[in-house]
């Protein structure tokens, strides 16, 4: 898949940290630049010298704004036999729905091949269930089958054929009270 007209890719360069954080703030992952920068350094500092070959941005042609990102990470310890992972995939909310996700997935798969990973693990979560569906559509397989509630939530929301072994759950099970509790 190719990026739509008006967008291009750029690889990470030292100094792009705050733009990476802003993508994640505007996609709902972080609430502050400080928290985002802490996550960035906690996660990437162990392979920061390789980041210019592993972290990519989607950039608008018109303004040069970085609006999406994904990284092929080096895992400190292998997971399920994989040493590389797709991490920190995000697109700013105002750019979601513009057919950028499939090109970004294609790009991170290309990057993985270029840096020597023939297989990847990908982490996702139920709060980004549309992304989870897209990853399954793209051919990713479920490895952590024991995470039954998460996969059942995804089945309820998407009815994806790869989730046939999981039962659907109720709305109450999807809306964990810890996530929707409001204090006065």
Give the predicted meaning of each segment.
Residues 12, 89-91, 124:
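Hydrophobic adenine-recognition pocket in adenosine-nucleotide-binding enzymes
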Residues 122-131, 148-158:
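Conserved beta-strand-loop-alpha-helix junction that forms the acyl-donor binding cleft
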Residues 25-91:
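A conserved beta-strand-loop-helix scaffold within acyl/acetyltransferase catalytic domains
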Residues 153-184:
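Acidic/histidine-enriched, glycine/proline-rich intrinsically disordered or flexible terminal extensions
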Residues 112-124:
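Conserved GNAT acetyl-CoA-binding A-motif
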Residues 8-20:
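A short beta-loop-alpha structural element at the N-terminal edge
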Residues 88-91, 97-114, 133-137:
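Conserved acetyl-CoA-binding loop-helix of GNAT-fold acetyltransferases
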Residues 135-145:
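Conserved acetyl-CoA-binding loop of GNAT-fold acetyltransferases
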């Amino acid at each position: 898949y190719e990026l739509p007209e008006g967008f291009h890719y750029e690889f990470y360069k030292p100094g792009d940290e705050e733009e990476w954080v802003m993508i994640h703030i505007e996609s709902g992952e972080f609430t502050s630049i400080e928290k985002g920068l802490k996550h960035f350094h906690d996660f990437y500092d162990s392979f920061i010298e390789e980041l210019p070959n592993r972290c990519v941005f989607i950039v608008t042609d018109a303004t040069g704004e970085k609006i999406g990102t994904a990284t092929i990470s080096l895992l400190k310890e292998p997971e399920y036999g994989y040493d590389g992972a797709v991490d920190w995939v995000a697109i700013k909310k105002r750019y979601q729905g513009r057919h950028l996700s499939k090109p970004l997935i294609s790009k991170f798969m290309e990057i993985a091949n270029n840096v020597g990973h023939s297989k990847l693990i990908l982490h996702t979560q139920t709060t980004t269930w549309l992304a989870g569906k897209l990853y399954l559509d793209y051919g990713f397989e479920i490895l952590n089958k024991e995470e039954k509630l998460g996969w059942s939530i995804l089945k309820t929301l998407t009815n994806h054929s790869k989730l046939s072994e999981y039962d659907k759950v109720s709305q109450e099970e999807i809306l964990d009270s810890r996530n929707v509790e409001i204090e006065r």
